[in-house]
């Protein structure tokens, strides 16, 4: 009837006298229409009377308190009225607020509770305020007991200016004095339990300090755990400085020390901060007494790679060996990149990057430069993970060598390349790998170089040796003439090794026949190159290897994809469950092959790349870069002698290849990002992060985060330039990219924590690159393979063995009885055998003989 009233505890009597209704009720919360004794307890309460529905009598309490302060109820309400003055609310039980009456339900004595807050009686500590926000309570504290000897349950709250349930049943009613209302406490209320002493308020400050001590205890971490490991975001390591620990220097030769980069907040209550091991010092000076953070830290952020090898060495080992952990040598260096907009494949934020000894030590805003650090201002520019180009061929009949190829890579923002090693003549694959490694040691390369081996036959033992001993985790199938059964066996073996198989989508035998056909037709120029390699033939090759790869549950990658039909075959295979991935050629993103039909032979010959360029392919390639998972863009960098190629008598013998390591990232940015097809994060994924995941480099490479290798590029997206071979690092005279305008500039490329390229010049000083060993079993490729092997999609029917041998059949029927099975001798004779011999059959069966009718 009155939904805005508090729940009724009990009703003593109800009388009906004419049109008046008398109801005696007791409320859970104060109401201006409930009976309440006067402050003196002597005057009689007035019962509200309803004379009729149209005529309302204003009722007031004669014993209104002279102090003008009402006692509190226990039920808040947000309603307000201009007629009725608000009363206050208290969270104390009614029995605890009563001074003159005792509760009908006895209340146990409780120990004094702490000061009451607005949070249901539980005080919020400073640590909880840090976690959940908020400040000090604005609710008035309860008044002290008039009699200190009274139990806590007898306390009375005197503040009556808080919200109270609205009294406005009807207009014209006045508020009654609702003091000393008694209600039994709720035994299930957590706040009442605190008052009764069943559970004291927890000491959040003490628990918070103990938890932080446990987190910051270096002994609580395994050797491979890095407390400073970060997730993307601008708050990584914010305001982190190191505390001076002289005692740790004596132990740096014994074992690595682990320091946490946890920023301790100030205490809200007293404004003081704790000073513990691993925390910042009080003055916040990270270079106090000339001591740098690296001097106090042995190995920065140490992580374990997939094969269990540590990715960072101790400081003592680095000083003795001169190895910076990235393949190069040199003294320890400190670099601070300021005000950069950091772009990872999943986040964009503004922060500074502190690099020490080739490892990213801190990512946070407003970092202070340590003593002796080199500062690189990147304001207004992007900081991206350095590019990873997984298909270069500078060691295969190229005018570039490893040194020149690496310079081209860093000039384009690439910090790591995967060089494809091809055996020469009768050279074994193991010998070819060792030959290239020797070249890497002799050359002053400025970027990281990993190797991928091209195989021409199924060499099982040599492949196993390369994976286990030489740091190889991928193989390239280029023109391998294997039958399907041998190819399936090869895929099974590669899967067991945990390596990635990469397939060049070209049927060499059929292509040779088509080239001869073109030459007979008089097509000798560059235009014959794409016509001798139809898209359908390329798609058929892709479809075939994807089917075999799916049968073997082996991850495969199709390299140098340049046709829409090949992409369609890959997408179809993935829909069928194949673990197939695409490596898009940067040349196919740039040009559509129309230049091959140009009248200018020199210009047309420059477009004779490893892959035939197709008309209408660039848009399809960009679409694949924006949608397919683990798709990468490769350059296929193999510059050739332009004069020799032009002088070739036909396209079949002309050398194929072009530059691309320096132009790859700029072309993808121009064609895909600037056109709005992909964003900057996807750009990072297709040029760096996805390749790092496929070749088991992630998260050491392909990401800007604490503990990752300091390989990054400072990218100016507001710049503009025209690509020209004369200003490129490659030795090729002319390129298919000549004359292309791009709206991006590589300001600086950092490899291994050192600036290798800046403002258009390659730094010849200390190199930080070198051979990069790759571990097998990338989790981004083989995690699904293990599950597929456990739950093979095969069906097996369990059948019980037959207890007796099946009886022989005669004339299509089982022999039912006897040792004699009579064959049919007449066409109309029944094939049913009733048993017995023919001599004993009755001649006159019931119903008469049937032979007489015939």
From Swiss-Prot:
It is found in: Cell projection, Axon; Cell projection, Dendrite. GO terms for biological process: axon guidance; chemorepulsion of axon; establishment or maintenance of actin cytoskeleton polarity; establishment or maintenance of microtubule cytoskeleton polarity; motor neuron axon guidance; negative regulation of microtubule polymerization; netrin-activated signaling pathway; pyrimidine nucleobase catabolic process. Expressed in ventral cord and nerve ring (at protein level). Isoform a: Expressed in nerve ring (at protein level). Expressed in the nervous system, two amphid socket cells and weakly in non-neuronal pharyngeal cells. Residues 57-114, 130-327, 794-854 are annotated as: Disordered. Residues 240-257 have a biased composition (Acidic residues). Residues 58-68, 75-97, 802-811 have a biased composition (Polar residues). Isoform a: Probable monomer. Isoform b: Probable homodimer. Isoform c: Probable homodimer. Probable heterodimer composed of isoform b and isoform c. Interacts with unc-14 and kinesin-1 motor complex light chain klc-1; both interactions regulate unc-33 neurite localization. Interacts with fln-1 (via calponin-homology (CH) domains and filamin repeat 18-19). Isoform c: Interacts with vab-8 isoform a. During neurogenesis, plays an essential role in axonal guidance and outgrowth by regulating the polarization of both microtubule and actin cytoskeletons. Establishes the asymmetry of axonal and dendrite microtubules and the polarized sorting of neuronal proteins. This is achieved in part by regulating the localization of kinesin-like protein unc-104. In neurons without a distal microtubule-organizing center (MTOC), also controls the organization of microtubules in dendrites. Belongs to the metallo-dependent hydrolases superfamily. Hydantoinase/dihydropyrimidinase family. This is Protein unc-33. The gene is unc-33.
